[in-house]
From Swiss-Prot:
Subunit structure comment from the entry: F-type ATPases have 2 components, F(1) - the catalytic core - and F(0) - the membrane proton channel. F(1) has five subunits: alpha(3), beta(3), gamma(1), delta(1), epsilon(1). F(0) has three main subunits: a(1), b(2) and c(10-14). The alpha and beta chains form an alternating ring which encloses part of the gamma chain. F(1) is attached to F(0) by a central stalk formed by the gamma and epsilon chains, while a peripheral stalk is formed by the delta and b chains.
Family from the record: Belongs to the ATPase delta chain family.
Keywords: ATP synthesis, Cell membrane, CF(1), Hydrogen ion transport, Ion transport, Membrane, Transport
Protein name (record): ATP synthase subunit delta
Listed GO biological process terms: proton motive force-driven ATP synthesis
One GO CC term, this protein: proton-transporting ATP synthase complex
Gene designation: atpH
Originating organism: Clostridium botulinum (strain Hall / ATCC 3502 / NCTC 13319 / Type A)
Length: 179
């Protein structure tokens, strides 16, 4: 529902990062802040606490991140606190990563297999996907024993499911329909 808003925030920060030639640094800093928030129960409690006012939350964030992140990132975080959107920072990070990929003619391909791909298989998959999408492919591999065998590929909204688990489910459905 708020994807459009997340994208606008991310685009604004991305443009600032580009102007300052710090896109990689901003992405790295934002990931670090997201991880800190996600892994700190205390920070989450503070951010969600209705009796801690916005000014105090901003002070806490300034104390926490002043010397750890670029001033523009800190300003961005403070705006998100002001607009009550800081709990959705991870969504802004994901949108900023998408923008980075788009601007650099790259696309993310999520691959699931039971065992790791061999180097040759990985290279061939990257080449074929690169030709299909006419972009540089960033491969994200995941080992998933539940697929039993085969490969699952997701590129954007496109899915190629060549897994044994899906084939077995399809066979089961066909058998149940015939009964």
């Amino acid at each position: 529902m708020y994807e459009y808003l997340d994208r606008r925030y991310a685009l604004a920060l991305y443009e600032v990062a580009e102007e300052n030639n710090k896109v990689d640094e901003y992405l790295r800093d934002l990931k670090e802040v997201v991880n800190i928030i996600k892994n700190s129960e205390d920070i989450c409690k503070i951010l969600k606490h209705p009796e801690i006012n916005t000014s105090r939350k901003k002070e806490i964030f300034t104390e926490l991140f002043k010397d750890k992140v670029d001033d523009k990132i800190l300003s961005f975080l403070l705006v998100l606190i002001e607009k009550d959107r800081i709990l959705y920072l991870e969504e802004k990070l994901k949108e900023m990563e998408k923008i980075y990929l788009e601007k650099n003619n790259m696309i993310l391909a999520n691959i699931k297999t039971v065992i790791p791909l061999l180097k040759e298989e990985r290279e061939e998959l990257i080449e074929k996907l690169g030709n299909k999408y006419n972009k540089k492919i960033i491969l994200e591999e995941e080992i998933d024993k539940s697929i039993i065998g085969g490969v699952y590929v997701r590129v954007g909204d496109d899915v190629l499911d060549g897994t044994l688990s899906t084939r077995l489910k399809d066979i089961k459905k066909m058998m149940l329909k015939r009964e």
